[in-house]
C-alpha cells in the first residue's frame, strides 16, 4: 500500500506541476471553452488574471507539498485535501461554462486521487 500511495502522490503532484509550469502556454484537449492556454482558460471561466495567479500558486505549492509528503507525512492531509478542493473548483468551472464532460476528466480524476491519498 505504501508504494501505491507514493505512486499516486507522484502522479498527482507531477501532473499538476506539468500543467502549470510546463504546459501553461500550450493548447490541450482539456482546456475550458475554446482556450489555447491557461490565461484564455481563466477568461473563458469569467475569472480575472489575478485569480489565475492565485490558483496557480496554490496548485504549485500544494503539488510540491504533496510530493514532499512522500518523506514528510505530516503535510499529506493539507496537500491532498487542498488539491481536492481546487480540483472540485476546476470541475465546477467546466460545468459552469457548459464544457463537455470529457474536458473535466483530468480535474475529476485528480480530485478522486487526492481524496484517496487523504483518506487512506
Give the positions of each predicted feature.
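Membrane-interface extramembranous regions
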Residues: 1-120
